[in-house]
């Protein structure tokens, strides 16, 4: 709703990284402390902030290697080879998870056929979005498979406004438990008021009430800096003309009890961005998995299917909680 000249020049509206949302700045349920955000579950179900995440897998073949379906006697256990075509490559538009083979590859070593087939990353899933391959004598033979994953926002995903007010999702609650106005307007997300004064992000508040006027008038607004002198007075007059409080404050009611809140709550329309920091890519844990040859200890690193090391201080925390076995 609120643009700048630079955002128009770089065609930001044609491929935005977020959506316009109704925000409320309030302390609610205690789950939006420390910059965390409370999300409206029904807004997520309607598709807000849904995104597509692409991951590409590429594999080359060298001497004595080929793309093919491995013999049943040499296959890796616990994996599904049924989605491969005769050339050893998965079918396009197939749904895959971390047990499906996407590229069948065999290698001949000392007269033995070794299975070197490729799966997608652990806990990943999605649809095969594109397949690119080269199989000629003039270049390296390769196969590239692109997987498209639908990412729905969940707890611990990160979001931010265009003014540096960033935070992770702390709680997702149904719409009927969210605060609401007398007109039935329910915010899409609730941010904490304690993150505003010390950061002095005045533009964050100005964009919210400007977006509110834009939604009432059905238009957009040029919010370029160092322009529109005294425009704040015009914005407040528009809000008053439409029977809203001039500074964007509204009377809200508790979604759990229906009681009116004792204080007014700031509400407005604002553009929020979904950031690339998603919990699906960062969460790390293991139950069973590979061990190192030398120490017989769990492997190190998320890529290897390893766990997090329990150091001295972590051990002390477990003992303080009364853990006798681990």
Feature roles, as predicted:
Residues 1-326:
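Long insertion/accessory domains within large nucleic-acid-processing enzymes
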């Amino acid at each position: 709703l609120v643009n700048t000249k630079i955002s128009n020049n770089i065609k930001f509206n044609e491929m935005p990284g977020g959506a316009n949302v109704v925000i409320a700045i309030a302390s609610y349920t205690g789950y939006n402390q420390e910059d965390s955000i409370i999300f409206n579950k029904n807004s997520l179900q309607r598709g807000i902030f849904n995104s597509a995440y692409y991951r590409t897998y590429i594999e080359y073949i060298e001497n004595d290697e080929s793309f093919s379906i491995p013999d049943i006697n040499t296959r890796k256990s616990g994996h599904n080879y049924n989605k491969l075509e005769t050339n050893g490559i998965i079918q396009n538009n197939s749904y895959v998870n971390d047990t499906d083979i996407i590229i069948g590859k065999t290698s001949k070593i000392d007269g033995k056929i070794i299975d070197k087939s490729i799966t997608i990353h652990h806990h990943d899933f999605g649809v095969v979005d594109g397949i690119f391959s080269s199989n000629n004598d003039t270049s390296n033979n390769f196969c590239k498979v692109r997987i498209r994953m639908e990412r729905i926002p969940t707890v611990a995903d990160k979001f931010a406004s265009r003014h540096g007010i960033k935070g992770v999702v702390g709680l997702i609650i149904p719409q009927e438990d969210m605060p609401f106005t007398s007109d039935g307007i329910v915010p899409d997300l609730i941010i904490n008021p304690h993150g505003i004064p010390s950061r002095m992000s005045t533009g964050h508040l100005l964009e919210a009430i400007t977006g509110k006027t834009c939604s009432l008038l059905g238009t957009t607004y040029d919010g370029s800096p160092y322009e529109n002198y005294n425009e704040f007075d015009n914005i407040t007059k528009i809000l008053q003309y439409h029977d809203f409080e001039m500074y964007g404050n509204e009377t809200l009611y508790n979604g759990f009890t229906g009681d009116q809140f004792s204080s007014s709550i700031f509400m407005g329309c604002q553009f929020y961005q979904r950031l690339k920091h998603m919990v699906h890519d960062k969460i790390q844990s293991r139950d069973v998995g590979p061990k190192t040859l030398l120490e017989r200890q769990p492997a190190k690193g998320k890529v290897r299917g390893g766990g997090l090391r329990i150091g001295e201080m972590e051990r002390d925390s477990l003992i303080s909680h009364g853990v006798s076995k681990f």
